[in-house]
Amino acid sequence: MALTYSSMLELGTQMPEFELENAVNNEIFSTSYFNSTTPKLVMFICNHCPYVIHYHKELTKLTQDYKDHLDFVAISSNDIVNYPEDSPEKMKELAIELGFFFPYLYDETQDVAKSFKAACTPEFYLFNNEKTLEYRGRLDNSSPGNGIEPSGIDLRDAIEKLLNGKEVNLSLIHI
């Protein structure tokens, strides 16, 4: 995979509003459906990316660990002509296989990804209950082939700080 730098949203930015189809149940999901008292985690993922595949187990664990404290949504913005394994049908299969209890949305036009300035997968955006961006970045410092097991340490630290009313400090990313 080529190294892709992402400009990402600035911290303190309000969550872009969107409506997309949930690949699992074909219903439209809107940001207005989020619980107003709960922080939100928006995850840009896809089915074929080796980095996302590397994180499957940890993503499942993390979302289960925080399901009572966060709202989750995953979005795939890939071109299914070039990546047929990222089609809504395949997204549904993966969501069922991994036990996703949250919406897995298909961004066919890539407009939502552009509004988040998401350039690669996976990318994580953690918003407070007022939909203000508190963290954007990686899950942890593991990657396919580097010998480090996924732990979610960077994202978990950000979530814990947010849930405990502490400042989320990006300088504390684990290298």
Predicted feature residues:
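Chalcogenol-based redox active-site neighborhoods
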Residues: 1-170
